[in-house]
């Protein structure tokens, strides 16, 4: 049986984390530079569509996710970052739906 699209997406997230974590230092954690590269290489349109391309946004995400303040992001902390990004994108998705609905029904 083949993986579902969601299962494949989850596998790709895990693989991507480890691919970037292995670039320097600990293979089980991301540095700030590794996180920046991961997000900008793999989600450039996503980050741009959120209006989040400014370098300080990723730094703020890193600091908020680094719960044990070791200046590294473990996989659990990485999931916090993904959750935050998905929530932001979900809100944007609803704003776009509302804007489309309002435009179609002359509510502006």
Swiss-Prot record:
Full protein name: Protein S100-A15A
GO CC aspect terms: cytoplasm; extracellular exosome
InterPro entries associated with the record: EF-hand-dom_pair, EF_Hand_1_Ca_BS, EF_hand_dom, S-100_dom, S100_Ca-bd_sub
Cystines in this chain: none
Keyword field contains Zinc: yes
GO terms classed as biological process: endothelial cell migration
Residues reported in the UniProt entry to bind Ca(2+): 66, 68, 70, 72, 77
Presence of keyword Transmembrane: no
PROSITE patterns, sorted: EF_HAND_1, EF_HAND_2
GO terms of molecular function: calcium ion binding; calcium-dependent protein binding; chemoattractant activity; transition metal ion binding
Species this chain originates from: Pongo abelii (Sumatran orangutan)
């Amino acid at each position: 049986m083949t993986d579902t699209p969601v299962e494949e997406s989850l596998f790709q997230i895990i693989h991507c984390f480890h691919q970037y974590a292995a670039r320097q230092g600990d293979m089980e954690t991301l540095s700030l530079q590794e996180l920046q590269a991961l997000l900008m290489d793999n989600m450039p349109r996503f980050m741009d569509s959120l209006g989040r391309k400014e370098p300080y946004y990723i730094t703020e995400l890193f600091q908020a996710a680094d719960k044990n303040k070791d200046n590294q992001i473990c996989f659990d902390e990485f999931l916090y970052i993904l959750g935050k990004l998905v929530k932001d994108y979900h809100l944007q998705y609803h704003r776009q739906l509302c804007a489309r609905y309002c435009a179609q029904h002359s509510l502006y």
